Regions:
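Sequence signature of WD/YWTD-type beta-propeller architectures
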Residues: 1-183
Length: 183
């Protein structure tokens, strides 16, 4: 499965265990000089859990390289219907890149949409799903461009998105005192 000519990371299985998803890009040997050329895609490969074998076919699901973007930090909803991910101009540490935005891939329709209701002029990244697949928590620097804060937003079963709101903290200064990033 590994390819010496590629950089591969962020692997995760589908909830049913029959697909392995991962990020991949062409290997760049002159880092950090060519860091801006790193553009990841999200791929999948079938997996047979009964026989513990991968299929031979790797499919590219999300590829924004022609749009000049790198897609990373994917997470799948527990019902397996949506993959949330971050897209940024390069690399894989999107929480540090202001242009980083969230996207959603519908595994049933094979459509990718920008999560415009969730995005801001600052970085959004690092998604996680509720157990019922209807809520997403993600990090955003929208408040000040410096500190990540956690936002929560609703998504319905067909992919309609609600406006996110700041995840309440007992102490409103918690994020500024403790962390610059959730990753």
């Amino acid at each position: 499965l590994a390819n010496a000519n590629k950089l591969e990371n962020f692997p995760f299985f589908s909830p049913d265990g029959k697909q392995l998803y991962f990020c991949t890009c062409d290997r760049i040997d002159s880092l950090p000089q060519q860091f801006s050329n790193i553009k990841y895609r999200i791929c999948s490969i079938g997996f047979d859990p009964q026989n513990n074998q991968f299929s031979k076919q790797v499919d590219t699901l999300i590829d924004l390289t022609n749009a000049g973007k790198s897609v990373t930090l994917p997470s799948i909803s527990p019902d397996g219907q949506f993959i949330a991910c971050s897209a940024a101009p390069h690399g894989c540490f999107s929480s540090w890149i202001p242009e980083s935005d969230l996207y959603l891939y519908n595994t049933k329709t094979k459509k990718l949409i920008a999560a415009t209701e969730w995005n801001s002029p600052e970085a959004e990244s690092c998604t996680t799903w509720s157990s019922n697949s209807r809520w997403v928590i993600f990090s955003s620097r929208r408040e000040d461009g410096i500190y990540n804060r956690l936002y929560i937003a609703h998504i319905d079963s067909v992919g309609n998105l609600s406006k996110p709101f700041l995840l309440p903290q007992r102490d409103p200064t918690y994020n500024q005192r403790n962390l610059k990033a959730y990753n």
